[in-house]
């Protein structure tokens, strides 16, 4: 038996920082380079490896992604449905739920998906991708994907980590394209959030999206009975 003396002072702080860093980097917050959380990146990478032009069962995609994502099938399935509902990177088939009504998607064995043409053209390039070993060392996965489009702004994101949170509102696809062209030409541009579900927004205190900025969104909520609230506009 080996007995070792250790200093307790500072140990909990180091443990907390290690855990916080792991949650931030591996679970909750997207990478600014491609706008994707690790589970989203691994889903897209798996779908690219499976790509043959045909739809795949979501259950099959989830199982394939588990080669790279060690946190269970439920988190993968939920993330895949959220990606599909944004109607940008994934071509969906079947009942994928409805973001307007809040209806959930059908079970993974009943719905299918494949990468959209936009994703195939914009997201992947093996020659410029930096790779790392997967969690068990059996496969390689991308550190980030070489996305040629500001996905972080297009999709928006909400993530809560240990001691850190991120919330970026979604933006309009066409406005992002126009802003990207102006940026490349070194021209001035204004860019504000947009919502798929519609509604009115006050951006007078947006602060160009920097910390401390705020937006005000009008919502119409009706009380039907003691158990039901209907959101008519947001």
Q: Where do the model's predicted regions map?
A:
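Catalytic phosphate-handling regions of large nucleic-acid enzymes and associated NTPases
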Residues: 4-212
């Amino acid at each position: 038996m080996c007995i070792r003396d250790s200093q307790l002072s500072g140990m909990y702080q180091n443990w907390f920082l290690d855990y916080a860093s792991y949650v931030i980097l591996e679970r909750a917050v997207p990478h600014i380079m491609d706008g994707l959380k690790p589970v989203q990146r691994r889903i897209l990478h798996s779908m690219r490896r499976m790509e043959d032009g045909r739809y795949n069962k979501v259950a099959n995609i989830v199982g394939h992604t588990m080669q790279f994502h060690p946190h269970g099938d439920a988190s993968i399935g939920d993330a895949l449905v959220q990606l599909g509902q944004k109607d940008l990177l994934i071509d969906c088939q079947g009942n994928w739920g409805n973001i307007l009504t809040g209806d959930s998607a059908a079970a993974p064995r009943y719905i299918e998906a494949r990468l959209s043409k936009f994703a195939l053209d914009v997201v992947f390039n093996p020659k410029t991708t930096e790779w790392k070993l997967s969690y068990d060392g059996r496969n390689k996965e991308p550190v980030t994907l070489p996305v040629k489009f500001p996905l972080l702004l297009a999709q928006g994101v909400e993530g809560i980590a240990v001691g850190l949170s991120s919330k970026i509102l979604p933006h309009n696809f066409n406005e992002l394209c126009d802003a990207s062209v102006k940026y490349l030409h070194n021209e001035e541009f204004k860019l504000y959030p947009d919502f798929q579900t519609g509604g009115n927004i006050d951006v007078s205190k947006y602060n160009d999206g920097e910390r401390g900025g705020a937006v005000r969104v009008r919502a119409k909520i009706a009380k039907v009975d003691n158990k039901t609230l209907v959101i008519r506009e947001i």
